[in-house]
Structures are given as structure tokens and as C-alpha cells.
Amino acid sequence: MKEFRSFLSPQIHSFIRYRQASQRWNDSSYEENLMLFDHYCHANDPCATALTQEMVDGWCRQRRTETNNSCRSRIYVVDSFVRFLNMRGLSNVQPPQIPRKERRRYLPHAFTEEELIRFFHECDSIPVINSRKETIIRKMSVPVFFRLLYSSGIRTKEARLLLRENVDLRRGVLDIQYSKGHDQHYIVLHDSMLEIMRRYDAAINGIVPEREYFFPSIRNSHFNRGWVTKNFNLLWRKANTSHATAYEFRHHYAVTNLNQWTGYGFEFHDKLVYLSKSMGHTTLESTKYYYSIVPGLSEIIKEQTENSSEWMIPEVPLDEETY
């Protein structure tokens, strides 16, 4: 854990332990934003011994360069921290005013076969530098990690936090414990992906024995969100000129399956339920979102299933966590 500087340090550590215990903590974003707030308090009043309204309001005020959503992301953990203190009688400061959430129309990148071929070629071409252990792990892990995203629709966070004990390499089933909303679900691997995972497991075990996570870092922990973003961006930009993100493999997986099912009529519903469960959606509404990003698909489904499709087609796409 990184160093907190202000008088709030003991209370921040208590807050983090509390959130981790309740599985409501995100190392990559919450800790960073909480640390920035801590450093802000220390820089502006290094002799302070109590949290003040001015500290909270000064840090949480929306900046001219921020959208409502980016401001919400930055101050959310501070709002939660203030409420944590208030509930325990450690502060009487009012939580910050959080801007209204803006609904965004998001159109994910549509991967082409050529783009994917070039990208995975770059993944497979990662060099080992001076036999350094860190570069060996990267060369072994990156191609498998991104192929898992591509072939299963798993969330990037789910893949990062995937425990080795929750990967059944005999049956080819992933037990997803850490997910959006903390709902456990299962993913069945394609045979080709299962074989890749088996080879990776045997190889990486020789580098990081007795590892806890299926994709281990050099410190035998899990990779953070920045690792995913950095590696994807670096390799994607080497291979392609278009903009894309690692999370869009999940969209690609859903859309590819939906496109393959347009001729199945009423069987489509059964397949949709299976897809929804395997992607970890708590309701079919979340899966229906993908209709809106498949050109013409909703009209095709209406033609095939007539009035029975009314419950399938969403009017407004739902937000999906992107990490």
C-alpha cells in the first residue's frame, strides 16, 4: 500500500480495510484518488488535525476541465470516506455535492479480422529483455490474457483477479468470484482456449510457483488495471491506426454471438439467456444493450419472432462498467 501523508492516514487505512473486507474496493482507482485527496490536505494545511468542510469542498469542487462523469469518478471515494467517518462519529463534515450522472451514447470499436490478426501477432512477438523475470512473465501472460478476453467475453477485472484455484483446467470452466455486482458466475472455455490456458499454467508455474492468481505479477499478486491498459495500447498502436480498448473485446464477443443467432427464431431466447449468464449479467436487460450496437439486428429479430420480441428490444442502452 502506498504512503499517505496527512493526519488522515490512520483513518484512511481503516476505511480501506473496511471496504476491502466488504469487497467494495478498487485498488487502481479508489486508492489513487484517495491518495491525491490526502496529499491535497497535507499540502494545504500540514499542521491540521481534523477534517474540515473547506478541505472536502476544495478538493471535490468540479473543475473546468471535468465532465460530470469524470468528476464523479474522482470524488466518489472521498464521498464514501466522509460518510464512513460520519457514521462512526469521527467527523461532522458534510459529504460533497456529486454532479448528476450524464448518460453517454457509447459506440464500441468494431474489430476487423485483419486488425485482430495484427494485434495478436504483436502479442506473440513481445521480446524478453536480458532474461529479466518481469519481461518473461509479460511475454508469457499478455498473449494468453488478451486471448481470454477475446474468446470468452470476460471482464478485464474478472480476468485480472482470477484465482488459480477457480480455474478448472480439466473441465474448462472458470469460476468468476470477483465481478461487477459481486455475482458469482461460470464461463466455459472454448477447446482451443482451454489448451492455451493449460500450456500457460504449466509454463508460468515454473516461473511463479505456488501462485495465488492465474495471471501473476512478478510479486505474485494480480495485475492492476493500468497493466491491462498500458499493454493493450502499446501493442494495438503498433499494429493498427484505429482507436480501441481492451474492454471492447467483451462487446465484440457479445455482438459476434448475436450475429450468428439471427436465424434461430425462438431458439434465440435460450441462447440469449446462456450468453447473459456466461457474461455475468444479473438481468437480461444488460445483455439486450448489445442489440443497439448491432446494425439492423433488432429489426431482424422482430421479423423472425414477431410480437414476442417486444420484451427483448431495449429502448435505452444500459451502462456497463468498463473495468
Please place each PLM-identified region on the residue numbering.
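Conserved catalytic core of the tyrosine transesterase superfamily
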Residues: 1-323
